[in-house]
């Protein structure tokens, strides 16, 4: 009998694949193991590391994921969550993967609203640790992995979530069933426009990402999701900490007290190969 935090992995035989030899992984005691004797221990928090030799980007440290968790829990991305929920309710996927999931907000929220097997990964072990600790329902299969080679079996997924993250269309095509869908959110032109104005930057231009997606896949549905929120000082500080737009910016060079509202804008696509 497995403890509750590890029970979720009892239904994953041969869905996970070995990152070293690509053979299917099966649960053996408290590890996932392949027939070539590669073993990956299940952490007591409820995740498995399938990228033991990989290093996460220095720009995505524990503090940035904690800040992101605060911003998401404050509701600033709830309209994007609602759009995802709308499409997932329509599709009813039996299996879903959240790529580059960060601290796991979308997977946790969506899994609590709809049935299905939810998988979620990030290259950052810190983020997956946060995600698994926050998963009170203990249902999402959290794992550390690399987007370049996702350790899941061919045609094992009904849907993939890609929210504000890079895409690997070759891997997505391999993983999705023939009728499977990609749900991809890209920033809208007004995304974080208030921060861009303070920095003296022009509005975001999403055309290149939009064009590349349409070259790779057929668009089945498209939602425009934009909302503006009032910021508390605490959420403003967390937003400034988590935003990739500010990674190369000296925050002390600007007066951020003037940032009292923020616009979160995205285009959400449902697409198929």
Mark where each language-model region is:
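N-terminal auxiliary segments of SAM/dcSAM-dependent transferases
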Residues: 1-57
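Class I SAM-dependent methyltransferase Rossmann-like catalytic core
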Residues: 57-79
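Conserved class I S-adenosyl-L-methionine
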Residues: 93-102
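Conserved SAM-binding loop of SAM-dependent methyltransferases across substrates and taxa
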Residues: 103-114
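A short acidic, Gly/Pro-enriched loop at the edge of an enzyme's catalytic core
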Residues: 148-159
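Conserved beta-strand signature within the Rossmann-like core of class I S-adenosyl-L-methionine
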Residues: 180-190
């Amino acid at each position: 009998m497995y403890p509750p935090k590890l029970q979720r992995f009892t239904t994953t035989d041969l869905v996970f694949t070995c990152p070293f030899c690509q053979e299917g992984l099966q649960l053996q005691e408290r590890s996932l193991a392949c027939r070539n004797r590669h073993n990956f221990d299940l952490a007591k928090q409820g995740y498995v590391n399938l990228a033991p030799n990989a290093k996460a980007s220095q720009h995505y440290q524990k503090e940035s994921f904690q800040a992101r968790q605060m911003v998401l829990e404050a509701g600033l991305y709830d309209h994007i969550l609602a759009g995802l929920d709308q499409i997932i309710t329509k599709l009813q996927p039996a299996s879903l993967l959240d790529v580059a999931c960060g601290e796991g907000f979308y997977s946790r929220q969506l899994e609590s609203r709809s049935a299905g097997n939810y998988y979620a990964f990030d290259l950052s072990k810190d983020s997956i640790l946060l995600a698994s600790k926050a998963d009170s329902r203990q249902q999402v299969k959290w794992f550390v992995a690399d987007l370049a080679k996702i350790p899941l079996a061919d045609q094992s997924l009904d849907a993939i979530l890609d929210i504000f993250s890079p895409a690997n269309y070759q891997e997505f095509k391999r993983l999705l069933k023939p009728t499977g869908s990609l749900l991809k959110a890209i920033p809208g032109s007004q995304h974080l426009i208030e921060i861009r104005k303070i920095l003296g930057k022009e509005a975001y231009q999403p055309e290149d990402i939009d064009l590349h997606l349409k070259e790779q896949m057929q668009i089945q549905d498209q939602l425009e999701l934009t909302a503006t929120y009032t910021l508390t000082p605490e959420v403003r500080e967390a937003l400034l900490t988590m935003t990739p737009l500010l990674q190369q910016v000296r925050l002390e060079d600007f007066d951020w007290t003037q940032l009292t509202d923020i616009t979160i804008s995205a285009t959400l696509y449902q697409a198929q190969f």
